[in-house]
Amino acid sequence: MAVPASDGSTASEWVTTGSVTVRVPGKVNLYLSVGDLRDDGYHDLTTVFHAVSLLDEVTVRNADVLSLRMIGEGAESLPADERNLAWRAAELMAEHVGRAPDVEITIEKSIPVAGGMAGGSADAAGVLVAMNTLWELGVPRRDLHALAAQLGSDVPFALHGGTALGSGRGEDLATVLARNTFHWVLAFAHRGLSTPKVFGELDRLRADTTRGLPRTDEPEPVLAALASGDPAELAALLGNDLQPAALSLYPDLRRTLRAGVEAGALAGIVSGSGPTCAFLCASAPAALDVGTQLSGAGVCRTVRVASGPVHGAHVVPAPSAS
């Protein structure tokens, strides 16, 4: 609810009471094709994003100055200033509407830090949606998407959710039909991987012509498998051009991938730039079994069971007054 601070004649004079909480999902790349290094330092990407039920909670409330607090595993390693994408999202949204970014942001982390699941991008998307709601701005979805794309390649998908085909740097999205709920086991590694370092390692490996590094095929079979809803069909088609680079930098991930398949997963893949490994399972009970076995295998820090696709960044309804 908005109440006028003075005569309410301008948007900046309206103050909103309370707070807004947004849930936003992590992602798994079911397919990731990485083009050669461009002159601008980026790579053209074609990817199939898949939002999974591993959710960060972003709460925004009005304050005297912009501040950011994060809680959850690994949160202490994250900067709580302009180096953080969530902070920059608040500044960008405020600039877009001509206001000061005077909000207090609290993020409860469940998506692993530096895990290849776009947790930082998810938090930035959560801030955009939360501020739009808290300040009752009515910024349309297409404009939120444009702001998200300014922040980073993975931020638009965190808004979009579901399953989507991404192109360009990953920010150009087309919705993909997925006829089933797919069940995943996510294995979090003992340490993170820097996305720029993984891309750099891929460039280095590709420059070594003696390696003959394989590349993913076209994405159409993956899209067909999603439309069919058959997890076994999809499992055979999972592919990630960044996986060899992630394995080169973090060889222990090979043990994790092997252990997950030996535990009964249909297939395993490094998610994005890693080091989180995502295992597709035949069913929800199968995922629980795989998760239990993988937990005891000693090959990763933490195991989570998740499903997808799920919605993108969305406001959590406030509890109704009794």
Swiss-Prot record:
Keyword ATP-binding: yes
Group of enzyme by EC: transferase
Recorded GO MF terms: 4-(cytidine 5'-diphospho)-2-C-methyl-D-erythritol kinase activity; ATP binding
Residues noted as binding ATP in the record, renumbered to the chain: P112, V113, A114, G115, G116, M117, A118, G119, G120, S121, A122
Positions annotated as active site in the UniProt record: K27, D154
Known EC number: 2.7.1.148
Pathway per the UniProt entry: Isoprenoid biosynthesis; isopentenyl diphosphate biosynthesis via DXP pathway; isopentenyl diphosphate from 1-deoxy-D-xylulose 5-phosphate: step 3/6
Function recorded in the entry: Catalyzes the phosphorylation of the position 2 hydroxy group of 4-diphosphocytidyl-2C-methyl-D-erythritol.
NCBIfam families, A to Z: ispE, PRK03188.1
Family indicated by similarity: Belongs to the GHMP kinase family. IspE subfamily.
Protein name: 4-diphosphocytidyl-2-C-methyl-D-erythritol kinase
Organism: Mycolicibacterium smegmatis (strain ATCC 700084 / mc(2)155)
Lineage: Bacteria, Bacillati, Actinomycetota, Actinomycetes, Mycobacteriales
